């Protein structure tokens, strides 16, 4: 498990009929001081309105995560059993990934109590100490844990690392598989995703995939967004031979990183050709500059492109952030016309977006804007 959510302590707290809220067990022992527990106990053994809810509280440079449980029955002292099995982490730790584990453990202990009085009987409750020890060690070591409770009950737990939200997939974005397409099995995806997978080739944009797969555009965007979240695809811009690119500082990684070199040369070499040389590929990337189109690059470097697929060259460069695209954004300098597509000429909408929204080709849009004295083109 990542160090960002390392568990420092696991505790079991309960409400004692005469002593009130107390820590019954903790692993390691004496980790939670009396002072810390006194500070947070109202969030560990809580009032009814906070019971069965995930609670995270930070105090004294520690973050405690718990899910207070209350089981009401006349067999218990004061007609209720109150307990909480929780985790303690550093105050700065990102603990979102641990919350489902805490919630699940609360549910398991509730079920075990209802079925066999596991928590309320002293003999079985003592089994919590070795269980908590295994939990602490295995979750910290591997992010997963299998807990045999008794002959008929086993608990399986796994920490699911939180992924950052991916960029929003737009109709003019081009999805590209991050690994070999054959590595992904169609059957593991929903029907919409299965329908569009054959059309993801690294060159079709989302709107084109929607049209050719005969799937509603918004459904395609949702499916691509899901693939993005799981890292199955990444997004690049539409490839046109009139496009302009320039290298980023990361292009230097191609010289320093052997594994990146291997991946790049395998990716960009033309099928059936002798393997491309690193020298040629690096020179091609460094030859990209403002004012140089892909068409210009092909005309100026026929020798270097003998074994290099220029489309794959651009695609790989974008995927690995070795290069970036300079896009054209039309800006209308007067406010006279607000018709479609003139309202898109604000400097906030790229050629890719405008062409997708209007159905115009790049050439048609270029001609239209070149003949309009009130339009200027901003490159960014």
UniProtKB/Swiss-Prot annotation:
GO function terms (MF aspect): GTPase activator activity
Annotated site location: Arginine finger: 124
GO annotation terms (biological process): cellular response to amino acid starvation; negative regulation of kinase activity; negative regulation of TORC1 signaling; positive regulation of autophagy
Keywords: Disease variant, Epilepsy, GTPase activation, Isopeptide bond, Lysosome, Membrane, Methylation, Tumor suppressor, Ubl conjugation
Keyword Ubl conjugation (UniProt): yes
Keyword 4Fe-4S attached: no
The organism's place on the tree of life at top rank: Eukaryota
Modification Asymmetric dimethylarginine, positions: 78
Cross-link (Glycyl lysine isopeptide (Lys-Gly) (interchain with G-Cter in ubiquitin)): 158, 357
Effect of residue 279 to A: Does not affect the GTPase activating protein activity of the GATOR1 complex
PANTHER family on file: GATOR COMPLEX PROTEIN NPRL2, NITROGEN PERMEASE REGULATOR 2/TUMOR SUPPRESSOR CANDIDATE 4
Disease / disorder: Inactivating mutations and truncating deletions in the genes encoding GATOR1 proteins, including NPRL2, are detected in glioblastoma and ovarian tumors and are associated with loss of heterozygosity events. Inactivation of GATOR1 proteins promotes constitutive localization of mTORC1 to the lysosomal membrane and blocks mTORC1 inactivation following amino acid withdrawal. Epilepsy, familial focal, with variable foci 2: An autosomal dominant form of epilepsy characterized by focal seizures arising from different cortical regions, including the temporal, frontal, parietal, and occipital lobes. Seizure types commonly include temporal lobe epilepsy, frontal lobe epilepsy, and nocturnal frontal lobe epilepsy. Some patients may have intellectual disability or autism spectrum disorders. Seizure onset usually occurs in the first or second decades, although later onset has been reported, and there is phenotypic variability within families.
Function recorded in the entry: Catalytic component of the GATOR1 complex, a multiprotein complex that functions as an inhibitor of the amino acid-sensing branch of the mTORC1 pathway. In response to amino acid depletion, the GATOR1 complex has GTPase activating protein (GAP) activity and strongly increases GTP hydrolysis by RagA/RRAGA (or RagB/RRAGB) within heterodimeric Rag complexes, thereby turning them into their inactive GDP-bound form, releasing mTORC1 from lysosomal surface and inhibiting mTORC1 signaling. In the presence of abundant amino acids, the GATOR1 complex is ubiquitinated and inhibited by GATOR2. Suppresses Src-dependent tyrosine phosphorylation and activation of PDPK1 and its downstream signaling. Down-regulates PDPK1 kinase activity by interfering with tyrosine phosphorylation at 'Tyr-9', 'Tyr-373' and 'Tyr-376' residues. May act as a tumor suppressor. Suppresses cell growth and enhances sensitivity to various anticancer drugs.
Entry similarity comment: Belongs to the NPR2 family.
Record's protein name: GATOR1 complex protein NPRL2
Organism: Homo sapiens (Human)
Encoding gene (name): NPRL2
